[in-house]
């Protein structure tokens, strides 16, 4: 199929001498270039308490990017699922879709750094992070659709409807970072897209 290019912009801080302000303005400039150059999408991630980047909430970055770009799709690369409650994730994603006028795509992963796990969900390992991701991802469309009650291993809540609802029909496309055959199977069976390149090194995606 057609190879479409995406930019993975992680706001890497190569030197401690770089201020956070400079890091962010460089990020915006890079994204403007990607948009003007006709790239399909810009993906930006979620990290906490790590010196090399400043991206605690990709939705914030994406809403700002929407004001600096015109055509490019804007994706979370990636949401770290186990750090989110499903209702909060569905609502923030839908609000972002609204604010970006329907340009949002959602990449979801279990996360990769024990540094973050230890600080945000103490005691959680990669296996349980994967289980949380597989529980949370399918709830999004159900919450956007509305009147969805959930009784899972990690989350339980009574009938809930996301407020707001996204403006894209059926919600923003959902991508699963498939680092193993399990997540690949999971993505296909839930009608999600598969992000095959490891997100920290990939620059293109195959569609």
Language model features with spans:
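Active-site-adjacent beta->alpha loops and helix N-cap segments on the catalytic face
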Residues: 54-60, 200-207
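N-terminal beta1-alpha1-beta2 module of alpha/beta enzyme domains
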Residues: 1-76, 169-172
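Conserved beta-strand positions in the central sheet of alpha/beta enzyme cores
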Residues: 6, 43, 105-107, 195-196
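Short hydrophobic alpha-helical runs that function as membrane-insertion/retention elements
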Residues: 73-75, 194-197
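Active-site beta-loop-alpha junctions enriched in small/polar residues
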Residues: 10-12, 47, 79-81, 109-113, ...
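Short, small-residue-enriched loops and turns at beta-alpha junctions
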Residues: 50-53, 81-83, 203-204
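Conserved N-terminal glycine/acidic-rich loop preference
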Residues: 30-32, 42-44, 83-87, 115-117
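Internal, glycine-rich beta/alpha segment that forms the wall or movable "lid"
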Residues: 2, 85-192, 204
